[in-house]
Design a protein with these regions (language model features):
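Short, solvent-exposed amphipathic alpha-helices that sit
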Residues: 62-77, 157-164, 193-213, 229, ...
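Flexible loop/hinge segments that line or gate small-molecule binding clefts
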Residues: 122-156, 160, 172-182, 280-288, ...
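Extracytoplasmic "Venus flytrap"
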Residues: 49-73, 77, 82-98, 112-116, ...
Length: 339
């Protein structure tokens, strides 16, 4: 069993950096943020400011870990983080929280969006009302926020998903280059920006390097970041494709649900390969029971801490532009790049 810890943070030995895109051109996100000059600065964010920190969904260990990092940063730096989400992942629920942030006088918002454009109008209204907007984990349109804190580029994460799959298949005795590998993607929805970008890159990588693989459902399987749906969808995949070799779950709710479905079917990692992204706490049971060989994660606590720090940094009157650098307490120097 192996965990690939992809992103911790750039100041740690051997780690790679988060990416942070500034408002501007579209496409891949980039490295971080800073003050309006090109030298690294350590300006302090405004003490007493309130950041509304919005996950895609509550009750999920990935987002709860992000909140831990956010709260630790806020306590250390003297501002407030209001972790406000809903157990049902939907545009309507997130819009309600955004509107409430405006009405209650928050200084900024840091949101992981459930939809790439569905929050745009609400966030633009928040900006007009004076709130600063940062996205993290999953983005919106560039003109609906100032900065995006991303865990990596689509290329990095999409290819990583396939490479973990190949590694686990080989450990089962499969030859990924020659065997006909039947596989499927199982994640949250067709509209979540981050997961779909990883899936697209991963699918292109498979077609280029493993043309012998067969996607049994090119429309993919979705479980809407709902734990029960993830289990149900996981069971339906196994029922519909009894000879499936690989299921890639690029979603922190889909992966444990799929693994539970595999375990319920009395299968192990010797029978089927399941991989993806999720936190150690949600996967350790299945690793111990030999249901999963390998999965990936990044340090979402650092990502959450960085998102709220930057949101409050902007709300404190600091300005950023592409090329700027800033020293974030406890994290290190980060740089704004075009997204």
């Amino acid at each position: 069993m192996k965990i690939r810890k992809f992103l911790t943070y750039g100041v740690l030995v051997g780690a790679t950096a988060f990416f942070l895109g500034a408002c501007g051109n579209s496409s891949q996100n980039s490295n971080s943020t800073s003050n309006s000059n090109s030298n690294a600065t350590t300006q302090t964010a405004n003490n007493g400011g309130k950041v509304v920190f919005i996950p895609k969904v509550t009750g999920n260990s990935f987002f709860e870990s992000g909140n831990l990092g956010a709260q630790e940063m806020a306590k250390k730096e003297g501002f407030t983080v209001d972790y406000n989400g809903n157990p049902v992942a939907s545009v309507a629920n997130q819009v309600t929280i955004i509107n409430n942030a405006v009405q209650t006088g928050a200084g900024s918002i840091a949101v992981s969006s459930v939809d790439p454009t569905g929050l745009d109008n609400a966030l633009k209204q928040a900006q007009k009302a004076g709130l600063k907007v940062v996205t993290w984990d999953s983005d919106v349109s560039p003109d609906a926020r100032s900065l995006m804190v991303s865990q990596g580029t689509p290329t990095q994460l999409g290819e990583m998903l396939v490479k973990m799959s190949v590694d686990a298949l080989e450990k089962r005795g499969k030859d990924p280059k020659k065997d006909k590998i039947k596989y499927a993607w199982h994640y949250s929805s067709s509209t979540v920006q981050d997961q779909n970008s990883w899936q697209k890159v991963g699918e292109e990588y498979i077609k280029k390097h493993y043309p012998n693989w067969e996607n049994v459902n090119e429309s993919n399987y979705y479980s809407n970041q709902d734990a029960q749906q993830a289990l149900n969808v996981g069971q339906s995949i196994l029922s519909a494709h009894k000879d499936i070799d690989l299921i890639i779950c690029n979603d922190s709710t889909a992966l444990p649900g799929q693994l539970q479905a595999v375990q319920n079917a009395k299968l192990t990692k010797k029978d089927i390969t399941v991989t993806g992204f999720s936190t150690p706490n949600s996967i350790k049971k299945y690793a111990k029971d030999d249901i999963i060989e390998e999965w990936g994660l990044w340090d979402v606590k650092v990502q959450g801490a960085l998102a709220v720090y930057l949101a409050n940094y902007l709300a404190s009157g600091n300005q950023v532009k592409v090329g700027d650098k800033i020293n974030v307490p406890g994290i290190g120097e980060v740089e704004v790049q075009n997204n």
